[in-house]
Swiss-Prot record:
Protein name per its UniProtKB record: Genome polyprotein
BP term (GO), one: symbiont entry into host cell
Lineage top rank: taxon: Viruses
Residue(s) at site: Important for VP1 folding and capsid assembly: R769
Amino acid sequence: MNMARQGLFQTVGSGLDHILSLADVEEEQMIQSVDRTAVTGASYFTSVDQSSVHTAEVGSHQSEPLKTSVDKPGSKKTQGEKFFLIHSADWLSTHALFHEVAKLDVVSLLYNEQFAVQGLLRYHTYARFGIEIQVQINPTPFQQGGLICAMVPGDQGYGSIASLTVYPHGLLNCNINNVVRIKVPFIYTRGAYHFKDPQYPVWELTIRVWSEFNIGTGTSAYTSLNVLARFTDLELHGLTPLSTQMMRNEFRVSTTENVVNLSNYEDARAKMSFALDQENWRSDPSEGGGIKITHFSTWTSIPTLAAQFAFNASASVGQQIKVIPVDPYFYQMTNSNPDQKYITALASICQMFCFWRGDLVFDFQVFPTKYHSGRLQFCFVPGNELIEVTSITLKQATTAPCAVMDITGVQSTLRFRVPWISDTPYRVNCYIKSSHQKGEYTAIEKLIVYCYNRLTSPSNVASHVRVNVYLSAINLECFAPLYHAMDVTSQTGDDSGGFSTTVSTEQNVPDPQVGITTPKDLKGKANKGKMDVSGVQAPVGAITTIEDPVLAKKVPETFPELKPGESRHTSDHMSVYKFMGRSHFLCTFTFNANNREYTFPITLSSTSNPPHGSPSTLRWFFNLFQLYRGPLDLTIIITGATDVDGMAWFTPVGLAVDTPWVEKQSALTIDYKTALGAIRFNTRRTGNIQIRLPWYSYLYAVSGALDGLGDTTDSTFGLVSIQIANYNHSDEYLSFSCYLSVTEQSEFFFPRAPLNSSAMMTSENMLDRIAGGDLESSVDDPRTDEDRRFESHIEKKPYKELRLEVGKQRFKYAREELSNEILPPPRKLKGLFSQSKIS
């Protein structure tokens, strides 16, 4: 009767319940077994019970009217995102310039049983997080000097120490501040950090001497240093049982048949692809902190350390303390152990272009005690790097654009923006050759530092104050790319050298990538000055505190100037995509036998030297940033008159591959190669191949600046293999040269300090590689030792001398041939050469 009164949905529902769920009591009694199934649990625990009963629940949770404990309940934020003291050290007066006071793997130090955060971390496998650190010192008023604290993603590698300001950093100046705070996001080649088995450190904190530590008489020869750190935005994944060893010990370890254009972004673009489909790759800045790089002004607008000089008490009023050429190539910071040349970020970028223009910005940061007093005058004299300025007096210098700085007070830094004043629209990069024509100049003027008021101080403090000189640029425009690794030796000890550049994007607007604020964003009276002349606007940023990250980003306007006008170029040569859209040399190899294959990895690692690593421009570029993701375009040039059949294929990292850098018979099947994706070609019908290498990787990104195991696993983009057949080595020569370029879908994240010039590794030419044994000659060299000496000799001769030398050798060989021939007895040839016959 009940069933008859139920509606349709009630009938269907009870039927399904009878089939899928619990039986009624009568059925349980009939089958002599309980028929109750329950699925219970919480979070990542599930329990399925076949003989379950309902939960016995009595009452509910109640809040306390009178709190038993008034602290906030424990949570991931209170336990995992609080500051912990991870390191203590002493900064000593014996520490030299650039001495590394501390080098800390912040994450591994936070993963410590002394810290509450480990209670969360040790039960999880993966995590994503940011890091925030505080570095504290406790100097006295009688101590002076400075430290730089920089958070470096991955590893410092061969990056320039003078360009540490490119990284997230803080500057400690004994006279200005005693604490710095740095907050960084998650920057990693993988989607998450593996606590149990890390590939490499995520963030490395380096603390180095930026200005040497000096003390007064009777003052302690040290100051204490403490480092606090915490996780931010902590995400934990992969609950795991507790094991005995949670972390391993760290260890370190489109073309035509005959013509191909490698010159520009459009013509070097590949039309064919190794990808499964003509697919595109979506942008993903999630592991790069959202800092995507598109323009070289990301580096040139950051002040980096170019030089250092001392303001001594012995300097008299009007004495020239320092003369600096106004060009972007100037840098003087070196180190002898190891031998390093610390290039500035500005010089590193500008050395790769032929011409430059723009406004150079000099930041002069002083390191006094509170008991030092004195003034410096800065002026610039228009001209070039060859002008003589030693005779210009202090009074004469006031005629030129100048600024005077009081070294003592709450502001530590004079920002001196030198406007573009020149007789040519652009200046030349004269460092790429040794001889110059009159009118080919690099610098636009010279900047002179004078003693304006003598340095005074008590006798119990140091009798000098050190001044750091930083260099950057505004409105920088560089054009006409080239490859050049500058050597600081051409400048050190002589202030007549120089270097400078400008940008062809919208003028007078700094690159927003570095987060430069506008003057309107700066609050407080400290950022506003007064001028004695009414109606004249005070210069913005002429005096600042470079130790403060916000004040350091003020756009400098030391002197009035006009806008530079419209660039003559329709293409921005400082665009990362335009510059690296041009194909750059990667490697070359020669086949010496038939039915062989050759595999070469495309690696970004800065520890792999050419010819098995990226050379010159590629090496420099891929170490300018931390993360790369996206496809690459490969151009293969075939050299030699051959009729050879070939096949090429691309292998993503982690799969089976033939031994790299070795010419050998392939151990892989044709099925495997074609499944990966292959192209077939014939060298008689084509002289070049342009192909797009897909972004096929199990990683989020790859990087060239990693430490430990990460340098091996996370630095390789993929591997390219070429196999040949029908090759007759005895009378044919077959060589391949490979060139690499970026694509419109390439992405570059998080800037790094540029490579030192000594780590650039220029490519060797083919003959040098054969002579060094790296490559086997394609054919037996028919030349004798005497032939080689002769060729080596004539290569060193100018053209006129070369012709005379060749003429002598021809006469010599002619005489030898005549003397060796057996001539018949001479006959008289009557009238053969008479005048009548010749006519």
